[in-house]
Amino acid sequence: MAVLSLAQMLEAGVHFGHQARRWNPRMAPYIFTVRNGVHIIDLVQTAQLVEEAYNYIRNAAEKGKRFLFIGTKRQAAGIVEQEALRCGSYYVNQRWLGGMLTNWTTIKTRVDRLKELESMEESGLIDLRPKQEASALRRELARLQKYLGGIKQMRRLPDIAIIVDVKREYNAVAECHKLGIPIVALLDTNCDPTQVDIPIPANDDAIRSIKLIVGKLADAIYEGRHGQLEEPEADLADEDDNGMTTSDDGDAEALDIPDDSDA
């Protein structure tokens, strides 16, 4: 039985690509036709690649591999967080901080600071500080939670990255390449499929499309770890509308955690 049916993908708008003038020619093998100036993705190939990705991820999860979901665009951010937590994985759904993987040792010091501040907040120690200092500490805590909360329990680099929109997340892709981390990615007709290990051609701007595919990849992780699909608990503690428009590509941020005013 197929992981995803054509009917499911059609209903979610997975087949809608970008305007033909915005395409990446390397996506040509995955394009079915052009309608009203918009590329239509070949869903037969999408279904095959979703199944390939599902089996690959499930098998990796069975072996104890760890996964990092990456998706910072508005349409993907909430889904990435929800599905990563559902299957006990890590996630980045805000700005990608330069060096988040390649400079992990430094990033880890900020993660440790996040844990320290959370402990201080929970124990009431922040309340004992002068008002101005307490306010500054809480602002710092909020910033760290926003940008690093999804990797708070990540003690080592992930084994596999699952990315929504490799064109937008180009810095994350580059860091994965440098470190030899395999990439499974949902990518639209304006992306380069040669940049990833398993490309899943799909509408990466429609919420329902993203939810459908990212949800299936999260299912694969959960099934690999637990042997069946049930509603899981977050499992991190032990580990050191069908829009067709795209959001603008976001620039990568420096290693410093940005202030909220810069977000």
UniProtKB/Swiss-Prot annotation:
<dbReference type="GO" id="GO:0022627">
    <property type="term" value="C:cytosolic small ribosomal subunit"/>
</dbReference>
<dbReference type="InterPro" id="IPR023591">
    <property type="entry name" value="Ribosomal_uS2_flav_dom_sf"/>
</dbReference>
<feature type="region of interest" description="Disordered">
    <location>
        <begin position="228"/>
        <end position="263"/>
    </location>
</feature>
<dbReference type="InterPro" id="IPR005706">
    <property type="entry name" value="Ribosomal_uS2_bac/mit/plastid"/>
</dbReference>
<feature type="compositionally biased region" description="Acidic residues">
    <location>
        <begin position="230"/>
        <end position="263"/>
    </location>
</feature>
<comment type="similarity">
    <text>Belongs to the universal ribosomal protein uS2 family.</text>
</comment>
<protein>
    <recommendedName>
        <fullName>Small ribosomal subunit protein uS2</fullName>
    </recommendedName>
</protein>
<dbReference type="InterPro" id="IPR018130">
    <property type="entry name" value="Ribosomal_uS2_CS"/>
</dbReference>
<keyword id="KW-0689">Ribosomal protein</keyword>
<dbReference type="GO" id="GO:0003735">
    <property type="term" value="F:structural constituent of ribosome"/>
</dbReference>
<dbReference type="InterPro" id="IPR001865">
    <property type="entry name" value="Ribosomal_uS2"/>
</dbReference>
<keyword id="KW-0687">Ribonucleoprotein</keyword>
<dbReference type="GO" id="GO:0006412">
    <property type="term" value="P:translation"/>
</dbReference>
<dbReference type="Pfam" id="PF00318">
    <property type="entry name" value="Ribosomal_S2"/>
</dbReference>
